[in-house]
Amino acid sequence: MRGYISDNGIYTYHGIPYAKAEERFVTATEPDSWDGVLDTTEWGPISPQGAILGGSANEEDNGDNNCQNLNLWTPALDDGKRPVMVWLHGGGFSSGSANGGNTDGTNLALNQDVVVIGVNHRLNVYGYLDLTEYGEKYEHSDNAGLTDIVASLDWIKENVAAFGGDPENITVFGQSGGGAKVLSLMTSPYAEGKFQKGIVQSGATETLGVTFATKEQSLAITDKILTKLGITEANIEDIQTVSNADLQNAATEALAETGAEFEVPLAIGDGYGMEWGPVIDGDYLCIL
């Protein structure tokens, strides 16, 4: 693959595919191979952005469900076995990305002699809509966003040595929602052995507006969304082609209604409401 060298000598790669999600709400698979040289000089696609803290999603959003890509910064392409730091962005589990200036790993790689990686993954309804009652295809749909992150760790462990990193010295770290993602990985048996350390920056669950849904809550959200969209078990595959605007609008309403039903306090202000996040299913995510 072809990246570029920054002005201060850091090897930089944007949009490296670590998996692919050809369908919504389905666990991503290995990325396609490519012929020739893969250009990784431009940012890759990010997840559609969802509502957060009771707001509304952007109906003009041009995000992509197939957003499984990462950005990488390294001081050298040698066998230096540098520590690897994997950044999980904030924005709850609903918004944000690993792209852009405020997630650029150049300075950290330069000043600390580490390999820095930022991960893009599915968010909001794309990452956490619980369709597990609709067949094996949707087995981990309730935690699809987490399955993306775990897939990125698999790619990193397998390939980071080629970028001067140590696959046995991987730290996941993140702020706010990113910190909560670190906590999620710490509880998931599917992430076991894929990283060695974690840093949680203001990402405490329950007390900072980041809550994990129970199975009862996640299924209630799903029932409301499908009803609003006119989707039943008989035509469940229509969920694959519903417009992003309709899907996000239904999701925003369902989160508010389910929060009121289960009396989940809003993170900010009075009243009730829920945010997108992982589901404690006893399998992919266990009780904290």
Spans of model-derived segments:
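Non-catalytic accessory segments of hydrolases
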Residues: 1-146, 167
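Alpha/beta-hydrolase active-site loop
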Residues: 67, 138-162, 216-224
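Alpha/beta-hydrolase fold nucleophile elbow
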Residues: 83, 156, 163-176
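A short beta-to-alpha transition loop/helix N-cap that caps and shapes the active-site region
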Residues: 125, 180, 204-212
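Short glycine-enriched nucleophile-adjacent loop
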Residues: 179-191
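A conserved short beta-strand
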Residues: 192-205
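Substrate-access "cap/lid" subdomains that shape
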Residues: 206-288
